Swiss-Prot record:
Endpoints of the signal sequence: none
InterPro entries: AA/rel_permease1
GO molecular function, one term: gamma-aminobutyric acid transmembrane transporter activity
Gene designation: BIO5
Name of the featured protein: 7-keto 8-aminopelargonic acid transporter
Length: 561
């Protein structure tokens, strides 16, 4: 028997042994062979395209400039500079914890699959095949079958519900991320118009119209999956080029200004400007952290591209991409912020501006047209970020549908709906149902919030905290619910029998920090951004949480009956 045949024999034997375990002890997830043989993704993502989609999505230097209004009002340049250091450190810890899981259990469902696998209680001991010299094909086939939901023994409602909740938290976090990108791009376009027409008065419906138009255009780019690796690489190169050009042009242009003196370093690194109304500068600093934290949103995107990378390669590529994205994001955003803050000649005008970054460009260059050009480069980069976010959210929903359709009664609405979301449309090789449903959700969010600045803050806070919760739950289960040493030994003994060993040690420290950071953000980012609190400036993030958990309850409840 050849090696590939032996791998399939292992999967068959596992299902046979599980089938003899009494039903009262387990609920096996089963999918028909026809469901498993449907259209699959092409494995056409490599290191550069995977890094491209991850970095294009977070795009820290653009994120920090697009949401600068909150940070500037909460503490000025000092908050953003030191906030970036804080956000980068904790994001790195979260990234390491994600990389730990992705290295041993590659699956496009990400955290939801890891939770499902960690809570698995094996009733029988299965012997895995051993090879003297396994080939790459053997390794890929084995991992693709081993790291699938239909090969996980589901023995409790807690296991089932926990994994689904994590998957849905991750998905809604991605949805709100796309919404925040559309909103920031709309504000960027309006900021250009304001610069060229100083008498312009901002209306909320202007932001709303721009939001919906941008969302409609972004929808078109994820219909075909074939160009996505090239778009991702284009986004990576465009982002780095735009960063370099805008930074250099601003610094050089500011150097030619002999009228206005350079700001003192003490004003940038040591002066805290609290305009929030909070009496406590510490509290003002904390609520303003939403700006630098948003610069590192979506660091898990690479974990959801496993099907388009390959299960074998992803064990090594995904952790490296996550860490590289965070490090490069911090370096570019930190340099960018420090440089541009030295270009400010009138901080009051920056604070009062519709879009502070455009005002900084104008103060640095003294030329409206050149400032518009620089902002257009940022918009182009942000547009690719929106495409990457659309890819990310559709992959989460597609993998969720594929993994959890069997949890529902065959023929039920939930079963049929998730099966539909899992389908890849032939010819497009893209999950169009998942993609269009996700874009509709983004459209609905825009209709609810109608372009208010308070709504934008709630959107970016929701995307931060929902994603962090989806990162923290697997870490919490790994540390405090299961016997972690036994789990690691079991996975390594299963996977490394055919796959090349991955010598990663899962340290407790990043997982503990990830949990604590999530709790911190969940509590403190829910406080009002400014005082006194009115209906217009209230932090509505808690309302978002309530709605999201109501929807999650409706989706998950039928699986518990």
């Amino acid at each position: 028997m050849n090696r590939v045949g032996a791998v399939f024999l292992f999967v068959y034997e596992r299902n046979f042994f599980l089938s003899i375990v009494p039903d009262r002890h387990r609920t096996e997830i089963r999918m028909s062979s026809s469901e498993r043989s449907e259209v699959k993704f092409d494995k056409h993502f490599n290191w550069w395209s995977l890094l491209g989609i991850a970095f294009s999505l977070s795009c820290s230097w653009v994120g920090i400039s697009a949401s600068m209004a909150v940070g500037i009002a909460s503490g000025g340049p000092l908050l953003i500079i030191y906030g970036l250091i804080i956000a980068a450190f904790f994001s790195l810890m979260c990234g390491i914890s994600l990389g730990d899981f992705a290295a041993i259990l590659p699956n496009s469902s990400g955290g939801s699959f890891w939770v499902l696998k960690m809570l698995e209680q094996e009733s029988v001991t299965l012997k895995t095949p051993e090879y003297e010299d396994p080939s790459d094909d053997d390794e890929e086939v084995f991992l693709e079958n081993y790291c699938q939901t239909f090969n996980v023994e589901v023995s409790s409602k807690f296991q089932k519900v926990s994994s689904m909740v994590v998957g849905l938290l991750n998905y809604f976090g991605a949805i709100f991320t796309t919404a925040s990108i559309c909103s920031s791009l709309s504000m960027s376009c309006i900021g250009i118009h304001k610069l060229l027409h100083p008498d312009y008065e901002l209306k909320h419906w202007h932001v709303f119209v721009g939001y919906e138009c941008i969302n409609a255009v972004l929808t078109l780019f994820n219909i075909y999956s074939t160009p996505l690796p090239y778009i991702s690489q284009f986004g990576l190169y465009t982002s780095l080029l735009s960063f370099a050009m805008t930074f250099i042009i601003c610094i050089v242009s500011r150097s030619d200004n002999t009228v206005d003196p350079w700001p003192k370093a003490s004003n940038i690194f040591g002066s805290f400007d609290n305009q929030t109304g909070w009496n406590s500068s510490g509290m003002a600093f904390v609520v303003g952290l939403v700006n630098p934290i948003w610069a590192f949103v979506g660091i898990d995107s690479a974990t959801h591209m496993i099907d388009e990378v390959g299960y074998s390669k992803s064990r090594f590529l995904v952790p490296k991409v996550i860490i590289t994205t965070i490090i490069v994001g911090f370096v570019t955003s930190f340099i960018y912020c420090v440089g541009l803050f030295f270009c400010i000649t009138d901080q009051t005008a920056v604070v009062e501006s519709i879009l502070p970054i455009v005002e900084i460009f104008y103060q640095a260059t003294g030329n409206r047209n050149l400032s518009v050009f620089l902002q257009c480069m940022c918009i182009t980069t942000g547009f690719v970020s929106g495409i990457a976010s659309g890819t990310w959210q559709s992959r989460i929903l597609q993998s969720f549908g594929k993994s959890y359709a069997p949890f529902y009664k065959e023929g039920s609405l939930g079963n049929k709906s998730l099966k539909k979301l899992a389908v890849l449309t032939p010819g497009f090789k893209s999950p169009l149902y998942a993609h269009f449903l996700s874009q509709i959700c983004v459209t609905i969010i825009g209709c609810i919030f109608m372009g208010s600045s308070t709504a934008f803050n709630a959107i970016i806070t929701a995307c931060i905290t929902l994603l962090l919760m989806s990162y923290a739950v697997p870490s919490f289960i790994f540390l405090f619910v299961i016997k972690k040493e036994k789990f690691i030994h079991r996975i390594e003994s299963d996977v490394n029998c055919v796959s090349r060993p991955n010598r990663r040690r899962m340290s407790m420290i990043p997982h503990i920090i990830c949990i604590l950071w999530t709790l911190f953000c969940l509590v403190f980012l829910s406080f009002p951004y400014t005082l006194p609190v009115t209906a217009g400036n209230m932090n509505y993030t808690s309302v978002v949480y309530a709605v999201v958990f109501c929807i999650i309850s409706i989706v998950v409840f039928p699986t518990c009956i």
